[in-house]
């Protein structure tokens, strides 16, 4: 059976354009991004544009291709302004009917043309369906409505049409044609389903009405030479045919209602309209223009359709007239007096948003090509939205924290759930110590036993005292030998008294002894602390080594309980409270279970609340409305706050759940407080509570005891370590003092030996001098008795000149004064290098080679040890003591043998000096050093800071920092060997045995 032909809209043609370069240029200039990053996206868009030029007009693939490109244009318009001022691209399209070209730089023109082609493709696809099949008929019905919807979108959104095919009049006419054809297709389906004539009449009446509306627009466009004339003929045929069908089916409905006269009148009207349709169909040309988009046999189909309908109407009219004339005799009304047939719309424009109803639009349009590019305005709006989200999350988090804090505070005030554990399980678990106690025992065990430390300190102190005793004995022995020699030789013994030279050394020894006394007192304090806590220390040490810290704690608690005035039985023997339910009312176990149930509910609410908050934070973090903001970019400024409020509503369920959790918690906390108070008021619970508090006090007392012992142990270990360091530093100091004493004694012994040798030589020389003088006197007498006047008495010559003693007052650095405060402190002594510089600022370090005796001035840069050198104080001709006010040696200025003055107490710093030898002949001033002489080290510094000691340093010239280490002197091995050899040949060495 031939089906009614349908009108389809031709597609607009277009020229090729280039999207790539303009887009890249705009990305680089406006967004400041590398355009090559978007090369693929630009190429994809350009390829879509090329594909739409060849889109098929009668297939769904062509429709999808056009829609995909249109969707990308919509997304592109949200990021790129395509117009004459920004991205300038000329879009050229040809009119679908007149084929005239139109070029514009507006993206709206490009989108309108694409939508027009989508509508055209939909109409072509609908017209090409074989409506004999139900699925094809439904497709045609849907596509005609969708085409009308797309044309409606053009009319509503593109107001200024640049071409005639996009004008409002043309598009409106096309909308009516598409809707009329959709209504006709629906009517065909109802006719095929043999629906009631009344329904068919209404559907046909609506179709005829739509064709009549379309006829006006088509007539106007044909007049303007836009549409082909065959469209006008076809619209006229369809209008008359559908109106005739409406009258025909309404007549059948009237006959069913016994309205035979009215039925005859309607059939007569239907015949008139059918004849008019047949007449126009006969005038339809056999060949149609290509631009009309109609098939070549369209005219034949229309003629056959109208002829068949006219035959049907005439046959029914004859039958109705016959029946009415012979049977019913009803009056036949005139055509003008007939009521209009009611209309039933069955077709309406399908909006663009419903074009792909039930399908994945994202799959058809594809992903947003330029999703990585976000406009600045959208970024700002997204930031504002993020801040709104953050406010919401912060507010909910604060509510959750507040609720959790209130729960924790209430449970802590009620001492739950710990109190329940005590009531249920007794006190066994409370006798166990905490982890701190175990750690205290481990720390005590890891440290060295204080008793061992005390023994080592005592040994160290005894060693230091023995060194000081030895040094004192050496100084006393040297002083005794010197005074015995002075008593023997009287004025001839010119060596400086030792007591004036050993003031500093003896003072240091005295100070060191005092420091040791102070240290002993501090040691006694530490020992007292050890005696007081030694038992606890030993217990903790043994418990840690044997792994019995818990048993130690339990024994201590048991002892504390036994010492109590009201001692109770051990916890293990306490009757269980849960087994002792003898009062009336609810049992204790029931009350405890009730409280535990409430606690479980509270904990469940807390977990649920925390989880809801976590989900809320995660959802807010993942919530990104950038795409929504982009889609609404053009209107976001008008309703931004409204959009934010709408989007934040998605978090409302989480907020409601948190609010409900808080309400539940408040109710449960009230119930918990009431139930727990009733439990505590039970006499059985009160009795056990009193016992528990007693045990807790005992446990706390044990904890405090061992905590105090542990703190005492830490203090003791710290004090012993400080004492150990102090004694080690003190030992270094007294060893340095011992070396200085040895050097001083050796130097004095060498000086005394030279002085003794000189005295013996002078006595021998004096005897020879008296004999010579006697001979000279006799010779003089003989000369006077002689008669020769040329002879004269010779003048006696002085055998040796007496060099003037030269003293230069030099200022030697003094030891800093010491203030003893009785506390162990780290000694602040100058380091060896600084102390060496303090004593010998003008000299280089001594050479390690053996020093030989030399006469004459030393060469330049030759080291001359600035120390106390006995060879420089020989009797030439006799000793000359320094002035009484001299307090230090001036080594660089002596020209004769002289001991330090009586009041000198330190070795001075001075320049290099010259000395005289043992010979009676004058010697050139030079650096004479006797064989084997070992220069003594600088005097020692103050003792280390002992108990209650604090050094106070004044402003001393050329002094080192007070925190420096003590100086240490060392004697080269070769010099020690030479000194031993000299002592073997020392004639004064035997004087050491004097008593």
From Swiss-Prot:
GO terms for cellular component: endosome. It comes from the Eukaryota. Residues 974-984 have a biased composition (Low complexity). Pfam families: ALIX_LYPXL_bnd (PF13949), BRO1 (PF03097). InterPro entries: ALIX_V_dom, BRO1_dom, BRO1_sf. Residues 5-407 form the BRO1 domain. Its main location: cytoplasm. The keyword Cytoplasm applies. Residues 789-818, 862-874, 904-925, 948-973 have a biased composition (Polar residues). It is found in: Cytoplasm; Endosome. The keyword Coiled coil applies. Residues 720-786 form a coiled coil. This is Vacuolar protein-sorting protein BRO1. It comes from Gibberella zeae (strain ATCC MYA-4620 / CBS 123657 / FGSC 9075 / NRRL 31084 / PH-1) (Wheat head blight fungus). The gene is BRO1.
């Amino acid at each position: 059976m031939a089906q009614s032909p349908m009108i389809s809209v031709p597609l607009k043609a277009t020229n090729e354009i280039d999207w790539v370069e303009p887009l890249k240029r705009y990305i680089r200039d406006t967004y400041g991004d590398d355009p090559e990053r978007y090369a693929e996206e630009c190429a994809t868009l350009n390829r879509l544009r090329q594909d739409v030029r060849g889109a098929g007009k009668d297939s769904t693939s062509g429709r999808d291709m056009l829609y995909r490109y249109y969707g990308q244009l919509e997304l592109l318009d949200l990021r790129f302004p395509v117009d004459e001022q920004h991205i300038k691209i000329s879009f050229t399209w040809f009119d679908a009917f007149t084929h005239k070209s139109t070029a514009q730089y507006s993206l709206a023109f490009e989108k309108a043309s694409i939508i027009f082609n989508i509508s055209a493709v939909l109409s072509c696809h609908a017209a090409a369906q074989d409506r004999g099949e139900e699925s094809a008929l439904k497709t045609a019905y849907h596509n005609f409505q969708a085409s009308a919807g797309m044309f409606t979108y053009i009319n509503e959104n593109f107001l200024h049409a640049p071409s005639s095919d996009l004008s409002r009049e043309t598009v409106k006419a096309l909308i009516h044609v598409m809707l009329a054809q959709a209504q006709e297709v629906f009517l065909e389906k109802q006719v095929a389903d043999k629906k009631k004539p009344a329904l068919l009449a209404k559907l046909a009446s609506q179709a005829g009405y739509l064709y009549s509306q379309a006829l006006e627009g088509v007539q106007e466009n044909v007049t303007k030479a836009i549409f082909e004339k065959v469209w006008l003929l076809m619209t006229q045929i369809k209008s008359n045919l559908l109106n005739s069908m409406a009258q025909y089916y309404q007549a059948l409905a009237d006959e069913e209602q016994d309205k035979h006269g009215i039925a005859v009148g309607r059939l007569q009207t239907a015949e008139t309209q059918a004849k008019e349709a047949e007449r126009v169909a006969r005038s339809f040309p056999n060949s149609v223009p290509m631009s009309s988009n109609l098939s070549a046999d369209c005219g034949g189909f229309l003629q056959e359709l109208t002829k068949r309908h006219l035959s049907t109407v005439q046959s029914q009219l004859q039958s109705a007239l016959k029946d009415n004339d012979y049977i019913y005799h009803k009056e036949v009304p005139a055509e003008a007096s007939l009521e209009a047939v009611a209309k039933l719309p069955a077709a309406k424009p399908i909006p663009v948003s419903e074009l792909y109803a039930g399908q994945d639009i994202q799959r058809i349009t594809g992903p947003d090509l330029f999703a990585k590019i976000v406009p600045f305005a959208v970024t700002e709006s997204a930031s504002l939205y993020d801040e709104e989200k953050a406010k919401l999350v912060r507010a909910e988090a604060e509510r959750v924290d507040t609720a959790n804090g209130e729960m924790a505070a209430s449970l802590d005030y009620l001492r739950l759930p710990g109190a329940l554990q005590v009531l249920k399980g007794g006190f066994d678990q409370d006798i166990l110590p905490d982890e701190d106690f175990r750690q205290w025992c481990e720390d005590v065990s890891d440290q060295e036993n204080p008793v061992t430390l005390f023994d080592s300190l005592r040994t160290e102190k005894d060693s230091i005292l023995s060194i000081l005793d030895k040094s004192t004995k050496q100084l006393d022995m040297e002083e005794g030998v010197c005074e015995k020699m002075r008593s023997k030789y009287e004025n001839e013994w010119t060596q400086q008294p030792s007591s004036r030279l050993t003031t500093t050394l003896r003072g240091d020894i005295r100070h060191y002894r005092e420091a040791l006394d102070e240290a002993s007192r501090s040691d006694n304090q530490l020992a007292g602390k050890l005696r007081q806590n030694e038992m606890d220390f030993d217990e903790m040490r043994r418990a840690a080594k044997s792994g019995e810290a818990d048993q130690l704690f339990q024994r201590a608690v048991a002892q504390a309980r036994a010492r109590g005035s009201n001692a109770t039985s051990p916890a293990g023997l306490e009757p269980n409270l849960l087994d002792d339910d003898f009062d009336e009312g609810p049992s204790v176990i029931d009350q405890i279970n009730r409280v535990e149930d409430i606690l479980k509910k509270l904990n469940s609410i807390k977990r649920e609340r925390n989880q809801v908050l976590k989900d809320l934070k995660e959802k807010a973090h993942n919530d990104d409305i950038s795409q929504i903001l982009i889609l609404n970019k053009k209107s976001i400024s008008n309703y931004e706050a409204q959009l934010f409020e709408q989007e934040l509503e998605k978090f409302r369920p989480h907020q409601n759940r948190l609010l409900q959790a808080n309400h539940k918690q408040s109710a449960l906390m009230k119930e918990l407080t009431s139930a727990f108070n009733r439990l505590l008021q039970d006499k059985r619970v009160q009795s056990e509570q009193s016992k528990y508090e007693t045990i807790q006090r005992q446990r706390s007392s044990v904890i405090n005891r061992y905590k105090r012992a542990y703190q005492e142990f830490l203090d003791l270990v710290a004090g012993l370590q400080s004492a150990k360091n102090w004694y080690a530093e003190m030992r270094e100091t007294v060893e340095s003092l011992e070396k200085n004493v040895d050097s001083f004694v050796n130097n004095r012994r060498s000086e005394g030996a030279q002085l003794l040798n000189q005295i013996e030589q002078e006595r021998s020389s004096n005897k020879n001098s008296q004999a010579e003088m006697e001979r000279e006197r006799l010779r003089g007498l003989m000369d006077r008795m002689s008669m020769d006047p040329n002879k004269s008495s010779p003048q006696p010559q002085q055998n040796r000149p007496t060099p003037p003693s030269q003293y230069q007052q030099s200022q030697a650095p003094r030891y800093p004064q010491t203030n003893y405060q009785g506390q162990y402190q780290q000694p602040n002594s100058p380091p060896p290098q600084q102390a060496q510089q303090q004593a010998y600022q003008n000299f280089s370090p001594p050479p390690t080679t053996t020093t030989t005796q030399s006469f004459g001035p030393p060469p330049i840069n030759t080291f001359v040890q600035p120390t106390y050198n006995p060879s420089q104080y020989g009797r030439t001709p006799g000793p000359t003591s320094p002035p009484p006010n001299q307090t230090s040696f001036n080594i660089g200025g002596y020209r004769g043998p002289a001991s330090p003055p009586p009041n000198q107490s330190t070795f001075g710093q001075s320049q290099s000096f010259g000395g005289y030898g043992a010979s009676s002949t004058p010697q050139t001033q030079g650096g004479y050093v006797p064989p084997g002489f070992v220069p003594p080290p600088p005097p020692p510094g103050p003792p280390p800071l002992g108990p209650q000691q604090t050094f106070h340093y004044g402003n001393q010239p050329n002094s080192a920092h007070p925190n420096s280490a003590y100086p240490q002197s060392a004697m080269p091995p070769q010099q020690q060997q030479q000194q031993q050899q000299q002592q073997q040949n020392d004639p004064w060495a035997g004087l050491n045995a004097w008593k």
